[in-house]
């Protein structure tokens, strides 16, 4: 049920400077106009999957991991926004460095897309590993991941309704995968009372 912010979010992906991507949108049995909004976009890069019932975030993200055709997976929540060079910069990072997951710093916005703050995550693998005992150290909506690495550790644990991202990061670290954050604001994460 993300109709309120969905157009802005989809447009932020379609307007990327890097154009060679598939936009896989999974509707988790919404009861608003989300599907109609998604179908209104005339862009062959968009593929919509509709769950037959509400399956929850972890299962839905695993469906996305299985169905995505790309080598790299960038995720975004329906109410968040990508900056124009997000995909380009994260792809360049993963092509240059032996990392499995890369996030970024975050612009915090309100329900009207006005900036209300900034979040600086640790950037290098060692700092992120050390921070994981305190907090996630990555904004889930900001990550791009190597699909094969994430699948090799079983994807998202379906036993969690929340913190499934934190669990994934911890398991990635335990398997020796490196995690980084680009020290740039590549996403805007929306803070509102409908979350």
Language model: regions and residue ranges:
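Acidic helix N-cap motif at the loop->helix transition within catalytic regions
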Residues: 4-7, 32-40, 81, 85
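Short, acidic, metal-binding catalytic loop of nucleotide-sugar glycosyltransferases
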Residues: 11-20
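Short aromatic/hydrophobic "clamp" motif used to bind/position activated sugar donors
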Residues: 73
């Amino acid at each position: 049920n993300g109709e309120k912010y969905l157009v802005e979010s989809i447009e932020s992906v379609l307007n990327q400077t890097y154009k060679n991507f598939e936009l896989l949108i999974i509707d988790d049995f919404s009861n608003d106009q989300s599907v109609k909004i998604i179908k209104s976009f005339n862009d062959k890069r968009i593929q919509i999957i509709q769950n037959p019932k509400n399956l929850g975030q972890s299962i839905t993200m695993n469906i996305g991991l299985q169905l995505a055709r790309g080598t790299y997976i960038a995720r975004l929540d329906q109410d968040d926004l990508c900056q124009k060079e997000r995909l380009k910069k994260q792809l360049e990072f993963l092509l240059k460095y032996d990392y499995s997951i890369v996030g970024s710093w975050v612009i915090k916005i309100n329900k009207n897309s006005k900036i209300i703050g900034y979040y600086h995550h640790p950037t290098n693998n060692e700092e992120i590993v050390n921070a994981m005992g305190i907090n996630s150290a990555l904004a889930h909506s900001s990550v791009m991941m190597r699909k094969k690495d994430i699948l090799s550790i079983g994807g998202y644990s379906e036993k969690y309704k929340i913190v499934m991202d934190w669990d994934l990061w911890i398991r990635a670290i335990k398997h020796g995968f490196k995690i980084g954050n680009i020290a740039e604001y590549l996403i805007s994460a929306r803070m509102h009372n409908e979350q």
